[in-house]
C-alpha cells in the first residue's frame, strides 16, 4: 500500500478493496478518487455496471458513453444524481481543457452533464456515467486505510472505460508489483478453497 505524504495526493488514484473489506457496497470495488482533501473524499466505483442504458436517463450522452453503454453505480451516496467521468486523449498535457470537462488527474476528468454533448464530442475518448458516488467525511478514509480496508494504487486512463468492468478488480491488482499482484488470485469465496 502506498504511503500518503500529503492529503491531496490521493486524488486521481484508485482505492482497491482488500479481500477483508466486508461492506457489500465495496466488496471487490475499484474506486477512482475524484477529490480528496482535509474536508473528505469523493470517488466513483468503476466496476459496478447496472442494467440501465445511458440513453434511458441521459439520452443526449448515450452516443459518447463507452461500452457496455450502461450507467454504473458510483457508490451508495446520492443514487438519484449522475456524474460523468471522461478520458480526454492528450488531456494530461498542458493543452487547454475542452469546455464542459474539468481535469481531475492526467487525462481523466469530470464532465458537466448540463453542457451540450456536442461541445465535448470531438475531445472525449471515453465517457462513463455514474449514478451516485462514494463519499467519506474528514479523516474517515484515512481511518479505513489504516485499518487495511483499501489498497491505494495508481490509476490508468483505461480503468475508467474498461470494457469488462467485472474483471477490473483482478486486472488492477495483477499489474501491481510484488505481493499485491498475488491478491488478484484470492478466491471469491475463500471457504470453498
Curated annotation (Swiss-Prot):
Recorded superkingdom: Bacteria
InterPro entries: AlgH-like (IPR003774)
GO cellular component term, pick one: cytosol
SUPFAM superfamilies reported for this sequence: VC0467-like
One Pfam family linked to the record: DUF179
Family named by the database record: Belongs to the UPF0301 (AlgH) family.
Record-given protein name: UPF0301 protein SCO2948
Record organism: Streptomyces coelicolor (strain ATCC BAA-471 / A3(2) / M145)
Amino acid at each position: 500500500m502506498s504511503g500518503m505524504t500529503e492529503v491531496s495526493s490521493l486524488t486521481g488514484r484508485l482505492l482497491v478493496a482488500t479481500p477483508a473489506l466486508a461492506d457489500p457496497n465495496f466488496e471487490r470495488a475499484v474506486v477512482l478518487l475524484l477529490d480528496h482533501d482535509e474536508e473528505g473524499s469523493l470517488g466513483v466505483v468503476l466496476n459496478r455496471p447496472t442494467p440501465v442504458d445511458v440513453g434511458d436517463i441521459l439520452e443526449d450522452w448515450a452516443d459518447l458513453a463507452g461500452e457496455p453503454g450502461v450507467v454504473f453505480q458510483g457508490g451508495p451516496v446520492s443514487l438519484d444524481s449522475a456524474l460523468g467521468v471522461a478520458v480526454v486523449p492528450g488531456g494530461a498535457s498542458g493543452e487547454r481543457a475542452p469546455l464542459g470537462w474539468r481535469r481531475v488527474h492526467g487525462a481523466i476528468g469530470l464532465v458537466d452533464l448540463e453542457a451540450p454533448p456536442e461541445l465535448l464530442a470531438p475531445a472525449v475518448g471515453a465517457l462513463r456515467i455514474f449514478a451516485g458516488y462514494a463519499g467519506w467525511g474528514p479523516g474517515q478514509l484515512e481511518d479505513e486505510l489504516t485499518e487495511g480496508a483499501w489498497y491505494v494504487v495508481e490509476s490508468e486512463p483505461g480503468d475508467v472505460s474498461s470494457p469488462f468492468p467485472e474483471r477490473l478488480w483482478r486486472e488492477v491488482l495483477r499489474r501491481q508489483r510484488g505481493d499485491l499482484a498475488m491478491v488478484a488470485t484470492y478466491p471469491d469465496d475463500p471457504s470453498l478453497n
